[in-house]
Amino acid sequence: MKITEVRLGLISVPLRVPFKTALRSVSSVEDVIVEIHTDTGAVGYGEAPPTGVITGDTTGAIIGAIRDHIAKTIVGRDVDEFEDLMIALNGCIQKNTSAKAAVDMALWDLYGQLYKIPVYKLMGGAKKSIVTDITISVNDPEEMVRDALNAIDRGYDCLKVKVG
């Protein structure tokens, strides 16, 4: 299974309610979508959120890192040489963690397809349950209390409260 092409796309998903922190207010979530195509027709998918304010990784930086460095490093290589692919991915450009993570996801997807094993099994198997949280946006204290109580009513028992 040889990598033949890396395609990039953008997606924007509107949020039901704007998410606010001290740094920004977000009303939609943007993602760079990565598709890695192979000579067998298999396609691996990954994604990277451009969160320049937090990570420094902007949409342009992610696309540029993948298009100008990472894709050139992995196209033509065999997915079965997984460890070498990962070493090449991590060594072809410094930093750019979001771009690398998106390609990493797509490579894991392809590796699982190659061996007909779901990625969750490749990574140790399924869990019966996982602990997750919900972040309460910065707002008036009364609205934050309402949001927290609403989250608890929806089954969350772990809250991350933004206070500034």
Spans of features found by a protein language model:
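Short, Gly/Pro- and small/polar-rich lid/capping loops
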Residues: M1-V32
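Metal- or metallocofactor-binding catalytic centers and their adjacent structured scaffolds
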Residues: E5-R7, H37-L114
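Residues that line or immediately flank small-molecule/substrate-binding pockets and catalytic motifs
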Residues: L10, P50, V163
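Glycine-rich anion/phosphate-binding loops
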Residues: V26, N96-D104, D140-V145
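Broad gene-expression machinery/nucleic-acid interaction feature
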Residues: D31-I33, A102, V131, C158
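Structured core elements
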Residues: I33-E35, Y45, K160-K162
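Metal-dependent enolase-superfamily TIM-barrel catalytic cores that perform enediolate-based chemistry
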Residues: K121-G164
